[in-house]
């Protein structure tokens, strides 16, 4: 069974991307650089290839983090931090110029939008792993993934209802990534231990502040992001969706229902970690973030496809396919509570199965949708020339 019906094909042919970026950093600093940088690519270079190259930078960064900090709680060599920063900067640059290349070559398409944002969704997990090694976050790495994934999903959800992707004056793809790669470069100078020690020791000027002075520096960053970035962003997303739904006499309950799969996914993984006898997130942070990141990529991709195909607003039931593995994982972890701490199946293999399941789900979705869109529009994914009629 395909993902796109006859109505979806007709909507794809009419779709036009709409996006607004209010960032001053992008407007006055990065955009002029990107406008020059895109010219290094030949006109035969397909935009999706540039997107894929940018994605590979993040994949390389995540692999470096795994090699030199398997549990994300030990300091890697300082050159690794510099590599993380450089690779993230290159990812941001390639992610910004793929759309410019599409306009240069007159090859813009709904597939490009889906491919771009789909890679960005997976990139949340990959960059979280890289940052986890830089800041020695350990099990907190999962929470850093949450605070990157939730605003991303909120922006995608808002885009689905408003038909315009609006980036505020301070936003994640611009200022957020810039802060992160500057953090990587900074860590290459001071060392990863700077993030793992108490706030008062890392910044002696504020050692007099009660409670905070004993908190780990990386957790200060985590809580600051939650209160000053994630919560305000979600409030704006929800407000904008409410305005659109109210103006169309729609149901806000149906709109909020689209958030159910992500909330359930995060809650399910946290409950699994709580029940597990081996402390999943601490011992296997890469696998937990990778498996959950792939499930998240499927959720984002499915919502973007619903937007491109002008599907009715509301929960897409097949989004819940990303949750199918969790009942088995939870049941297996629960058997350990009933069997003296020994689960029915070793938790490592259950976690590995989770990653294989979500990878298979995402791969099937991605390959199927790419095939259906290229067939419907008569285009190629990695070639600029159109298919012969």
Swiss-Prot record:
Its main location: membrane. Pfam families: CDP-OH_P_transf. It catalyses: CDP-ethanolamine + a 1,2-diacyl-sn-glycerol = a 1,2-diacyl-sn-glycero-3-phosphoethanolamine + CMP + H(+); CDP-choline + a 1,2-diacyl-sn-glycerol = a 1,2-diacyl-sn-glycero-3-phosphocholine + CMP + H(+). Signal peptide: none annotated. GO terms for molecular function: diacylglycerol cholinephosphotransferase activity; ethanolaminephosphotransferase activity; metal ion binding. InterPro entries: CDP-OH_P_trans, CDP-OH_PTrfase_TM_dom, CDP_ALCOHOL_P_TRANSF_CS, CHOPT. The chain crosses the membrane at residues 49-69, 141-161, 176-196, 220-240, 252-272, 286-306, 321-338, 350-370. It is a multi-pass membrane protein. One of its GO terms (biological process) is phosphatidylethanolamine biosynthetic process. The keyword Transmembrane applies. Gene3D superfamilies: 1.20.120.1760. Pathway: Phospholipid metabolism; phosphatidylethanolamine biosynthesis; phosphatidylethanolamine from ethanolamine: step 3/3; Phospholipid metabolism; phosphatidylcholine biosynthesis; phosphatidylcholine from phosphocholine: step 2/2. The keyword Nucleotidyltransferase does not apply. Its EC number is 2.7.8.1, 2.7.8.2. It comes from the Eukaryota. It is found in: Membrane. Its cofactor is Mg(2+); Mn(2+). Belongs to the CDP-alcohol phosphatidyltransferase class-I family. Catalyzes both phosphatidylcholine and phosphatidylethanolamine biosynthesis from CDP-choline and CDP-ethanolamine, respectively. Has a higher cholinephosphotransferase activity than ethanolaminephosphotransferase activity. This is Choline/ethanolaminephosphotransferase 2. It comes from Arabidopsis thaliana.
